[in-house]
UniProtKB/Swiss-Prot annotation:
It catalyses: tRNA(Cys) + L-cysteine + ATP = L-cysteinyl-tRNA(Cys) + AMP + diphosphate. Keywords: Aminoacyl-tRNA synthetase, ATP-binding, Cytoplasm, Ligase, Metal-binding, Nucleotide-binding, Protein biosynthesis, Zinc. Its cofactor is Zn(2+). Its main location: cytoplasm. It comes from Staphylococcus carnosus (strain TM300). Its EC number is 6.1.1.16. This is Cysteine--tRNA ligase.
Length: 466
């Protein structure tokens, strides 16, 4: 059974869907005013793996992820570029598909856009006003936060805690500093829509509530996003949605950890804002994805090139092992006396499912994949190989690949390049120096499986191709 950590209850819980065999999942998507940065890429990749694992377990997943195409950032960008907001949004939505496609993120079942739901948003706000949960003031519409009794339950804060530091900004006409905006009065020169409250545009929080409601219904199974969205965005979504629907908004809340750049928070002011569009010109997108899932989704992750290179090395180990298995397939026989390998492969598959069942622990899943690669390296050194064993290796390698979204072959994977071999030899030398003989032997076996022979000489270790 799959268990996942629920931010709402602060504990791991068995997953019990609203409808047997189906998952309704909503993931907060990007504001499309620029190319996505790696902070946007992390949830896209992490929750893609969650979706893939649910599908592997037989679930039908309705995966919805929105585009915020009406926002202060878009309006600012529109003025800077002298382009319309829809033009900018269209361009960066296309860029999003290109970048996430390169990262092997499956397309969502639906990617709703705010502009396409404007009538729905206005009706939703009208309902909240009619029920007394919202009020008009000076052309804006605000949500009465205190009227919603459960406010703070996701971020585990009380109203009194939240009141400290709450301020009414200049120009706002709120009843209470804790109230938040549902509809913003139009400003000269800004994109706007007609509404019963006057010309304006929606606030950020109401957009996701409405799109989730229209796409997935009153209650959804899983709502996911970055940790930075937990408060106030997701907290406000709950308040709006449950006030409107009179039903729980989401049964499970998932939040992924932050990304730091060289141990510093990513920010434009620090000049370390890293766009996926730029990274994948230098780093293989498969390696970037492998790096992203090498850490549990709830943990923070530190991005630097040393760690990315380590991920590249790890992925190469797996791919080289799979390639070696494929190469032995042509000379495999029908022998039946190697069942112990089948048993070990199946044990590793069971281990993979066990760690993925435990809150989608991709870090441990990758460790299991390394173990499978290590077993494969050992097997290809056998004098004779079995078709059944080779086939089972290939099946399980493919399962791991499909679930984690990491292709077993690079886009141009041929034989190992000389510089790759030299890098492995250097890694082996370091392992031997550190008395990590198991890793040293593993590298030797990996190279041997690729018909690369190591020779110790007075000048150091050399290699030759067999």
């Amino acid at each position: 059974m799959i268990t996942l950590y629920n931010t709402l209850t602060r504990q791991k819980e068995p997953f019990e869907p609203l409808e047997p065999g189906k998952v309704k999942m909503y993931v907060c998507g990007p504001t499309v005013y620029n190319y996505i940065h790696i902070g946007n890429a992390r949830p896209a990749i992490n929750y893609d793996v969650v979706r893939r694992y649910f599908e592997y377990k037989g679930y039908d997943v309705n995966y919805v992820s929105n585009f915020t195409d009406v926002d202060d950032k878009l309006i600012k960008r529109s003025k800077e570029l002298n382009e319309s907001v829809p033009e900018i949004a269209d361009r960066y939505i296309q860029a999003f598909y290109e970048d996430t496609g390169a990262l092997n993120v499956k397309k969502a079942t639906s990617n709703p856009r705010v502009m396409n739901h404007m009538d729905d948003i206005i009706e939703f706000i009208k309902d909240l006003v009619d029920k007394g949960y919202a009020y008009e003031s000076g052309g804006d519409v605000y949500f009465r936060t205190r009227k919603f009794e459960g406010y703070g339950k996701l971020s585990h804060q009380s109203i009194d805690d939240l009141k400290v530091g709450a301020r009414i900004e200049s120009g706002e006409q709120k009843e209470d500093a804790l109230d938040f905006t549902l509809w913003k009065k139009a400003k000269p020169g800004e994109i706007s829509w007609d509404s019963p409250f006057g010309k304006g545009r929606p606030g950020w929080h109401i957009e996701c509530s409405v799109m989730a409601y229209n796409e997935l219904g009153e209650t959804i199974d899983i709502h996911a996003g970055g940790s930075d969205l937990q408060f106030p965005h997701h907290e406000n979504e709950i308040a709006q949605s449950e006030a409107h629907n009179h039903a729980p908004f989401a049964n499970y809340w998932m939040h992924n950890g932050f990304i730091n750049i060289d141990n510093e928070k990513m920010s434009k002011s620090l000049g370390n804002f890293v766009l996926v569009h730029d990274i994948i010109k230098e780093v293989d997108p498969d390696v970037l994805r492998f790096f992203m899932i090498s850490v549990h989704y709830r943990s923070p992750i530190n991005y630097n090139m040393e760690l990315v290179e380590s991920a590249k090395s790890g992925l190469e180990r797996i791919r080289n092992s799979y390639q070696a298995i494929e190469e032995r397939e042509a000379i495999a026989t029908d022998i039946e006396d190697q069942s112990e390998y089948i048993e070990q492969i199946d044990q590793l598959l069971a281990q993979f499912e066990k760690v993925m069942d435990d809150d989608f622990n991709t870090a441990n899943a990758i460790t299991t994949w390394y173990d499978l690669a290590k077993l494969a390296n050992k097997y290809v050194l056998e004098n004779t190989t079995s078709k059944k064993v080779i086939e089972r290796f290939k099946e399980v390698f493919q399962i791991f690949s499909d679930v984690l979204g990491i292709p077993l072959k690079g886009k141009q994977q041929d034989e190992l390049l000389d510089e790759d071999i030299e890098a492995l030899i250097e890694e082996r030398n370091e392992a031997r120096k550190n008395k990590d003989f198991a890793r040293a032997d593993e590298i030797r076996d990996q190279l041997k499986a690729q018909n690369i022979i190591l020779e110790d000489t007075a000048q150091g270790v050399r290699f030759k191709r067999g």
